[in-house]
C-alpha cells in the first residue's frame, strides 16, 4: 500500500523542522506514524554507501553530474520508504546561492518522490531575521528582512511549480512568533488521513 508522502519546506530559521517534529508527536498519539526524512541526510547516506564521500562536508565539492545521480538515488530510496509508512521529507524548496536560486527539488527528484502534498512554512521576514540573529548555534549568511521575503516568494513559486509537475497540493502554514501551537495544529490537520 502506498502511503502519503509530504514535503515540508521553508527558509532557514522559519522553524519548519520544529513545527514538523511537534506535529508528528501529536499524530503519533493518534497512531499515525510518519517517518521524517531529511533530504540532505538521505543524499549523504546514498553517497556514503557508494563510497563517494566519507563525511558530509565533501558533498558540496561533488561535480554536478554526481550530485544529480545522488539526488535521484536519494529520491528513489525515499519513494521506497513510502511503501512501508507515511513519510515527511524535510528539505528546502529553493537554495539561495551566490549565482541565484537553485531548485531544491529538481524534476529528476520529483519524478522519484511523486509527493502528495508540498507544505511551505512561512512567517514574516522580520520574525525570521530576529530568530536567526538570536540563534548562536548556527552560522548563517546575513540577510535583510527584504531578502528573506524574496526567498519566501521564490519558495512559493517553486512549490507551485512542483505541484504543477506532480499534481501535489501546495499548502502554506504560518509559524508566527508566540503562535507555534497554531502552526503545529494546522500541519497536524493536513497530515491526518
Swiss-Prot record:
<comment type="similarity">
    <text>Belongs to the archaeal adenylate kinase family.</text>
</comment>
<keyword id="KW-0067">ATP-binding</keyword>
<protein>
    <recommendedName>
        <fullName>Adenylate kinase</fullName>
        <ecNumber>2.7.4.3</ecNumber>
    </recommendedName>
</protein>
<dbReference type="InterPro" id="IPR023477">
    <property type="entry name" value="Adenylate_kinase_AdkA"/>
</dbReference>
<dbReference type="Pfam" id="PF13207">
    <property type="entry name" value="AAA_17"/>
</dbReference>
<dbReference type="GO" id="GO:0004017">
    <property type="term" value="F:adenylate kinase activity"/>
</dbReference>
<dbReference type="InterPro" id="IPR027417">
    <property type="entry name" value="P-loop_NTPase"/>
</dbReference>
<keyword id="KW-0808">Transferase</keyword>
<feature type="binding site">
    <location>
        <begin position="10"/>
        <end position="18"/>
    </location>
    <ligand>
        <name>ATP</name>
    </ligand>
</feature>
<keyword id="KW-0547">Nucleotide-binding</keyword>
<dbReference type="GO" id="GO:0005524">
    <property type="term" value="F:ATP binding"/>
</dbReference>
<keyword id="KW-0963">Cytoplasm</keyword>
<keyword id="KW-0418">Kinase</keyword>
<dbReference type="GO" id="GO:0005737">
    <property type="term" value="C:cytoplasm"/>
</dbReference>
<comment type="subunit">
    <text>Monomer.</text>
</comment>
